[in-house]
Amino acid sequence: MSDAVGPDPVVQRGDAVAAEPVDAAEGLSKAVLLDESDGAPNFAMRRFELAPGAEVPRHTNAVEHEQYVLAGEYVVGIGDEEHVVSPGDALLIPAGVEHWYRNAGDEPGAFICVVPNGDDAIELVG
């Protein structure tokens, strides 16, 4: 047993977290799985779903994003390159780097996205 002082452990059941539409892109939804309101001191973990035919416009974020693809096959544009991603792929999108998403397939795409807690300024590009 440890004498370390820190946050209490949390187990968040996926079906207990409601997904909400994301205003910036039709067909994109987000569920916040863990963040500072749950006692997570450093990072927020979110689950995104990208519906078939959905596109997220080019944008930048003030904070880095680490992503892990759960389902589907879709395109992620990062900088000047496009990448087709599928389950098991992991991505690092550094702060300030332009990126976008496009799901041209028939199945939803889903990914986990981890970001630092705190404010994130999002700027649409173009």
Predicted regions and their residues:
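Structural motif
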Residues: 73-75, 82, 98, 108
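Asparagine-centered strand-capping/turn motif at beta-strand->loop junctions
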Residues: 103-104
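Conserved short histidine dyad/triad with adjacent acidic residue
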Residues: 30-31, 46-61, 95
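A short hydrophobic beta-strand segment most commonly corresponding to one strand
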Residues: 47, 107-124
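Short acidic-glycine-tyrosine-enriched beta hairpin
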Residues: 80-96
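Short, surface-exposed secondary-structure boundary micro-motifs
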Residues: 96-97, 116
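A short, N-terminal "cap"/entry segment at the start of jelly-roll beta-barrel domains
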Residues: 1-42, 125-126
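Short, conserved beta-strand element in jelly-roll/cupin
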Residues: 47-51, 61-76, 114-117
